[in-house]
From Swiss-Prot:
SUPFAM superfamilies named in the record: Translation proteins SH3-like domain
Molecular function as annotated in GO: RNA binding; structural constituent of ribosome
Keywords: Ribonucleoprotein, Ribosomal protein
Protein name: Large ribosomal subunit protein eL6
Protein source organism: Dictyostelium discoideum (Social amoeba)
Amino acid sequence: MALDNKFVAKGLRLYSARSVANRTKTFVAKKNKVVAPKKVVAPVTPVEKTFGKGKRVIAAKASKFAPSIPAEIRSTAAKKVQQKVALRKSITPGTVLIILAGRFAGKRVVALKQLDSGLILITGPFKVNGVPLRRIDQRYVIATSTKIDVSSVKVAATINDAYFAAEKKSTTKSEGAFFSDEKKAEKKKIADSRVADQKSVDSAILAVLKKEKFLTVYLKTKFYLKKGEFPHQLKF
């Protein structure tokens, strides 16, 4: 018996599809499943034709849309192209930045250059406020109007994105380490080359800071908001 499932609104019926199935018991009727026969691909056999006194094998006919030269077949795989990230106009080499998030939040640092990945290479200097050479995204910094002349600061070409790549740790553990209850935290040892790079960059920046009277104290001071101060009303 058919169920009168009339429209109660535009595009909306009185009963849902499940309600109609439960009321009419249409799910009880078993439908015969039609199994489609599998297509058997016939093997391609070479065709031999007689031309005059001799015989010749006819080559298999290529597809109508197949390229005549195999070299023209191109891969459909997408090529990964790293687009250059545009840096804000307020951020230039020597600009003093305020870090907004992370371990060094609130610290004032000096921007050195933009790396190929789009991240900014910064330094404290380390001797002034404890911020070493590191990368940071421009969305996590505020550019101030204070600028330092870093034309005399030479950053080595080796200090790039690969310079800051993390070392892969081995996941395999020995039997003794697996069953040991005590876990000793190993202190990460800084490479001598990194220490030398930090000292060379810091020494050049410190020479520039000595020329300005309160610039070293300014970089040492941590940024924070006082009561009644709002960041959108401040001029950095």
